[in-house]
């Protein structure tokens, strides 16, 4: 059985200036701050912003490359309990030691063949 990805859950983005980025997305799209200082094991100023169906996880990297960078993107997965076995079956690299537990959800992080990190989450938007 395949993993059943339902939606793109969120986009995790490196930004040069956190305050400027939050202002941009608030002013242009009406996004609100869903979580202040991100408590997600990231050693950089960060926030989660968005609306009911879109979440952007922004963290500040002032000296990042001019073209920007997406740290990872997330899929909400219907059959979460099958992720580890399915990844092992296909030889997919599992990151961070397996299941990562958050306040309201849990995730498994994997690496695609091009080196992009994907977060496979149990609950849409991490329950935020």
Regions found by a protein language model. Give the residues of each.
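Vicinal oxygen chelate
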Residues: 18, 73-117
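Short glycine-enriched loop/turn motifs at secondary-structure junctions
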Residues: 4-7, 65-69, 101-102
């Amino acid at each position: 059985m395949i993993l059943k990805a339902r939606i793109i859950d969120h986009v995790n983005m490196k930004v040069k200036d956190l305050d400027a980025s939050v202002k941009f997305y608030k002013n242009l799209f009406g996004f609100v701050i869903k979580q202040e200082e991100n408590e997600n094991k990231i050693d950089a100023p960060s926030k989660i912003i968005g609306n009911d169906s879109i979440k952007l996880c922004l963290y500040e990297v002032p000296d990042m490359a001019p073209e920007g960078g997406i740290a990872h993107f997330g899929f909400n997965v219907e059959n979460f309990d099958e992720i580890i076995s399915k990844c092992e079956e296909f030889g997919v690299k599992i990151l961070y030691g397996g299941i990562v537990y958050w306040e309201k959800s849990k995730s498994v992080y994997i690496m695609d063949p091009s080196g992009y990190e994907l977060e496979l989450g149990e609950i849409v938007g991490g329950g935020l």
